[in-house]
Amino acid sequence: MKRIFLAIAVLCYAGAVYGQDGGRIHRSEFVPFDTREDADALNRKNTDKYLVFAPGLLNDGEEVLGIGDVVNLPNGWFDSFIYLHLENTGTAYTLRVNDRTVAVVEDPFAPADFDLTPYVKQGDNIILLELHESNTPELQKGFTPTPVKPFTNSYLFAQEKRSIRDFNVALIPDSTRKFGVLDLEVIVQNGYNYEEPITVGFDIYAPNGKLLDFSVNDITVPGRSLDTVRFSPYIYHTYENSWGAKGAAPLYRVMLYTKRKGVFKEYIPLKVGFGKTEMKDGKITRFDKPVTIVSERYNAAADAAATCKELLALKKKGINTIWPNAPQPYWFYNLCDELGLFVIDQANINAPEKRDDRTAGGTPSNDPRLADEYLERVRNMYYHSRN
């Protein structure tokens, strides 16, 4: 919500694309919860259709097939979308499920998401990663991430065929600069072949926990397609809780949910700070006032506790903006939100030794051979953490 996106490329992606054929997808990183209590506590352990993915060496007799796991998916997971989230692979890889290629991923450091729905079956499923060297090493020569346990924060989960696909959320000043407006778009998906009704709602709570507004909307979505539900309620007294003002970082809580025949089906918790970061006359502004950016290169430590300690030390030095080299774990952005730190998000494009080479093919930005992978990395960065 407070990200300042590094202008590595200018891309206009209008919402998530419905991917009926599965494979790699691009959207905000989130896991739906079965109950409001677990959503508030970010407790994934009680979510029925959620599994930690911790692969190891996969063998067929004496032959090592690669890194992977045999995952048993019960009948209750089906009639759903089934997703895989991978992080900390450490190298490029080809993802195969039940002997079918799902995707080839060249970026060894950024999180990636996949729709496995067309590839999996009830019972045992072989999820295999064939690891290999990246074909585009030029894009990450200048960056080595902090070592962490391989596949940390990798998981599978399922969502109903009528569910939330993605969202865009911001809490911004209104045109009079007196109040706030919750600018919320909820992208819903219908995986059936025929139109289906979906009930979508939200609640928003002040930093002190007070319920400020809520709404529930019914929408009918055509078969195998997406639609967007938009909410824009006025939120009063927001200027009393401005994010970033004098170093304060109060956050509003937003809860998204869906219902089916009166029964709650999923909860997705969000946090958002009040304010809007803009470019005016070549200057970064917030609340129509210039912001002095004091930045430092920094990438997440091995865990959230160590990262929080290091971020606090940077803030004590007067740093107000963090500039990582590649997309970070979801909890990194949450920490920066809570600590009142801006983030200049960057795709995993790091080639400092070529920064002054203006010839064709010199820098990654000017190399036609790298164009497809370059744009893929920017796209992944944008969707992963744009909220």
Model-derived features: where do they sit?
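Alpha-helix capping and helix-loop boundary segments enriched in small/acidic/polar residues
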Residues: 302, 323, 365-372
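Short, acidic/turn-prone active-site loops that include or flank metal/cofactor-
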Residues: 107, 347-352
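Short beta-alpha connecting loops at secondary-structure transitions
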Residues: 139, 354-369
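Generic structural signal for helix capping and beta-alpha/helix-loop junctions
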Residues: 331, 352-354
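N-terminal/domain-start segments enriched in small and hydrophobic, helix-friendly residues
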Residues: 345, 349, 362-365
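An active-site-proximal structural segment forming one wall of the substrate-binding cleft
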Residues: 367-387
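Secreted/periplasmic carbohydrate-active enzymes, especially glycoside hydrolases
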Residues: 1-7, 17-330, 334-343, 377
